[in-house]
Each structure stands twice: as C-alpha cells, then as structure tokens.
Amino acid sequence: MAKHERGLRFQPTGGSKAPQIPTGKKQRLSIERLANDGRGIAFFEGKTWFVLGALAGEEVEARVLGAHGKVVEARTERVFSASELRRPAPCQHAGRCGGCSVQHLPHNEQLALKQRMLAEQLSRVAGAEPEEWAAPLTGPEFGYRRRARIAVRWDSKAKKLEVGFRAAGSQDIVAISECPVLVQPLQPIMTRLPEMLRRLSKPQALGHVELFSGSSLAVLLRHMAPLSEADLTILKDFCAFHEAQLWLHGEGEPQPVDDAQSLGYHLEQWDLQLAYRPGDFIQVNAGVNEAMVAQALEWLKPTADERVLDLFCGLGNFALPLAKAAREVVAVEGVQTMVDRAAANAASNNLHNTKFFQADLSQPLTDAEWIGNGFSAVLLDPPRDGAFEVVRKLAALGAKRLVYVSCNPATLARDTVELIKQGYRLKRAGILDMFPQTAHVEAMALFEASQDGSSDPTGRP
C-alpha cells in the first residue's frame, strides 16, 4: 500500500571514503532499538543500519537496499531470534510489498510507537508537553483503506504486464492477489483487475489504476494512447460487473465515462455529502476521518455566535461540519480548484454561512480581505510542510482556541515553538491512527491562549 518509509538525506563529510556496502549484500545483525519510523536500528563495523521489518532485541539477517557514508538501509530477510512482541504478518505479501511496514507489530504496540514518536518530537524540538494526553483515535486495523493506487507496467523483455504494488526499497512491482487493509468492496476488484488489464490490446500504453470506495465504487485507468472500442467494452463490462464507475485519464483531466457520475463520501454525523474528483486529497480512512472531525469540533467548541477560520480547508472536510455549529466559517485553501470544490460542496449541502478563499498559505499572512475583524477559533490542517508562516500571525487574529491537525509530528513540533512564543499553551494532544500497519503518524493538538498573554517554554500556563 502507501509507502511511508522515507529515504535519508546524506551530507558529504570529507576525508577518506569508507568502502561502500554493495546493494543486495546480506548481514547478520543485532537490533538494539526501533527508530521513529518503525525500522530496527543496529550498529555494525562503524555503521548504523536501519532495517525494515526488524524489532528491538532480535537477531536478523538483513539484505542491503542502499548505503551511503555510515548509514545503511536494509530489509529483514530472516529472523534468527524473534522478539516476544513479533506476530505473524497478517498479509501474505509481507516482506515483498512496500506498504504496511510495521504489520509484524501488534496493533497496540504500533500505537505505542506512534505515541512515542509524537511525544519525542514535541519534547525534543519544542521542549513542550501537553497538559493532557488524549487517548489515541483508532478504528479497525484492517479493511480501512477506501482508496488505492495500483502500479501497472509493461515488461518489454518478458513481454508481460506487471500489476500490483511497489516493492519495499525498489521500483519493482509485486503482484497482489489481496490486500488486507483495503475496504471489503474493493477486494474483488483488486483480485480480478490484473486478468482484465491483460486482455486489453495495448498493455504497453497503460499507466496506473486507482480504486475508490465512498458513496459509490470507481475504477480509474491512466492510459497513454487512445483506447479501442473493444478495450472500452472490456473496461465497461468489468466495471458494470463490480457495480463501479469507470473513469479514464488520457490527455487532460480524468473524466467519468458517464458524465452523470461523480465521486463522493458522506459524513454521517452531520448528514453531509462531499463530492471530489480523482487527484483531490481525501483521507483514505473513512472511519477515523469522521472520528477526527468529531474530535476537532469537540476540542474547538465553536458556538453559534462565533466566527471560525479553517486554514488548508481542502474539500471542506472540516469547514462544512464547523458551519453546522458556528455563526460563520471562513475557509482558506491554496489551490483554486479545491476552493471551488469546497464552495460547491457547501452550496449542495445548503450551507450559506461559509465563505471560501484562495491564498498561498506558505507565505506570510497579509491584510487579506477574509481576515476581517478576526476569529474566535482557528482550525489548521496543513500538509507535511506544516504552517510556519501562518502560525506566526495567528495571535494577531484574536483566536483564543486553535486545533492543529498534523500529518507530520516534526513540523507540528516546530510550529508549536512559535505558538508558545505567541502566548498559546499546549492544552491537549494525541495521535490519530489513520494508517494502521504503517509507521505514519497523524496527530491533533489543542492550543489555548494564556489568560495573561504570557508564554512558558514547556507549553504549560
């Protein structure tokens, strides 16, 4: 599934170069502890090894994926002495597929790893600890993913079409017969997809496939050459059998074969329907997404006489539920097409107390028209880069309460430093288990303005 293992950035150190370890070499290692990304850490012959699929205290044989300087990245090939925490991998493709990098850890241990990662970032970078730790926000550990991207590639030497997910540490494609983290309605589509694609007349012109599950099922095919009528019939019949929409992505933007069809998802607690298109960002975990929105509103506590600001609003995932509680919601997003989509979603849900604006939120906030007389509360849901320029000006907007939803604890911790400088205190924080079986951490933090306007480096009043 989705890959969350990130490559390391190396800097030249000068001096004589140590001989590099060749890719593919196998080495027996003793794993001392876990890194924040879930990989095992070992030390051998002056080098630090980061080993996928290994746990603290284990003896493993690892295969080198890449090396530079004193850092080696590797993957577990064999476990000689297993940790008592290790469980059998729930997926038959474990160790080959590049997704689900911590599925060998029980779910409660995965949560502990993510909690530790968030706490360490806040402590190390911001010197802060929340006054209260919220319980992890969780859902089912399997069958949660409502969107998936399937790699498709023509092997000209073998004269065959490869269909599956990217392998761990390489661009190879691993054939996948089933994926335990996909929602159940997508499983039969996933299983039968390779056979259908191999029936098409120009397999070398096929790109990736995306699967969607929401208010309806959908299959999107990226193709680099026009499809024949026979191929189009095969695709239509496949989607009709699975009761799924068919979307095609040739030149230009993806389009449904049936113009009347659209993609969307429902937020049941607020009876809201949000439409989106392929390429738009949505949270892949529907259950945790709805619980996240509910928790954000519970923490922010918007009232019927308050003006609330939603930054990085996307499709309106937070803005529309906020509009059910607040007097007015001003929502800002960097991409104009998403602004238009959010405004259309508000209109289709008969919400008229929302205003949507486009602004580059990576730049310092200026006297934008949407600021007006300020806001009682602010919600932020930035991308991985965080919201540094935005948080530098939030105190000037008069907000007493801030909820920060983060997909990167490192930038959340960095931005926490700035918020504390402005007189906010870190009231509450917790993890959101949006991606079970991976080490990817989502988090939510509540900041409140100190009554006397003073700040404390610990985040406490």
UniProtKB/Swiss-Prot annotation:
Q: Does Methyltransferase count among this protein's keywords? A: yes
Stated role: Catalyzes the formation of 5-methyl-uridine at position 1939 (m5U1939) in 23S rRNA.
Instruction: Please give the InterPro entries that the UniProt record associates with this protein.
Output: 23S_rRNA_MeTrfase_RlmD (IPR001566), MeTrfase_TrmA_AS (IPR030390), MeTrfase_TrmA_CS (IPR030391), NA-bd_OB-fold (IPR012340), SAM-dependent_MTases_sf (IPR029063), TRAM_dom (IPR002792), U5_MeTrfase_fam (IPR010280)
Active-site residues are 407
The question of whether Nuclease is a record keyword is answered with no
Residues the record lists as binding S-adenosyl-L-methionine = 283, 312, 317, 333, 360, 381
Q: Which UniProt keywords apply?
A: 4Fe-4S, Iron, Iron-sulfur, Metal-binding, Methyltransferase, rRNA processing, S-adenosyl-L-methionine, Transferase
Family, as annotated:
Belongs to the class I-like SAM-binding methyltransferase superfamily. RNA M5U methyltransferase family. RlmD subfamily.
Which protein, by its recorded name, is this?
23S rRNA (uracil(1939)-C(5))-methyltransferase RlmD
- Where do the record's region annotations for Disordered lie? 1-26
The TRAM domain extends over 20-78
Q: Where does [4Fe-4S] cluster bind?
A: 91, 97, 100, 179
